[in-house]
Amino acid sequence: MASRIKKGDQVIVIAGKDKGKQGEIIRIDGHRVVVSNVNIVKRHTKPNPQRSISGGLIDREAPIHVSNIQVLNPMTGKGDRVGFKILDDGCKLRIFRSTGEVIGA
């Protein structure tokens, strides 16, 4: 089954404390995604000399639920719903519902 969102998509947050922020999908974990520069949290980390990690407070992105994001439509500059279009050769493409444009083309 094809996914409505993919790693590298430009998305906009539509709900939550970071509503309106835009970013790129870094990682997908089931129904949660990590978006660059969105949902920044502080983590207390211990120093680990074997991995050359200095301890202290580190800011990093935390995952948010996929229902709180929409794929950013570059033509309109707004978040848009994602649909699928099946070509004659059986290839499945992701499209924007409002404009019908192919995503990532």
From Swiss-Prot:
UniProt cross-references to SMART domains, sorted A to Z: KOW
Coiled-coil annotated spans: none
Pfam families hit by this protein: KOW, ribosomal_L24
InterPro entries per record: KOW (IPR005824), Rib_uL2_dom2 (IPR014722), Ribosomal_uL24 (IPR003256), Ribosomal_uL24_CS (IPR005825), Ribosomal_uL24_KOW (IPR041988), Translation_prot_SH3-like_sf (IPR008991)
Protein keywords: Ribonucleoprotein, Ribosomal protein, RNA-binding, rRNA-binding
Keyword Membrane carried by entry: no
GO cellular component terms, semicolon-separated: ribonucleoprotein complex; ribosome
GO MF annotation list: rRNA binding; structural constituent of ribosome
Gene Ontology biological process terms in this record: translation
Cited PANTHER family: MITOCHONDRIAL RIBOSOMAL PROTEIN L24 (PTHR12903)
Family: Belongs to the universal ribosomal protein uL24 family.
Physiological role: One of two assembly initiator proteins, it binds directly to the 5'-end of the 23S rRNA, where it nucleates assembly of the 50S subunit.
NCBIfam families for the chain: rplX_bact
Subunit structure: Part of the 50S ribosomal subunit.
Protein name: Large ribosomal subunit protein uL24
Species this protein is from: Xylella fastidiosa (strain 9a5c)
Organism classification: Bacteria, Pseudomonadati, Pseudomonadota, Gammaproteobacteria, Lysobacterales
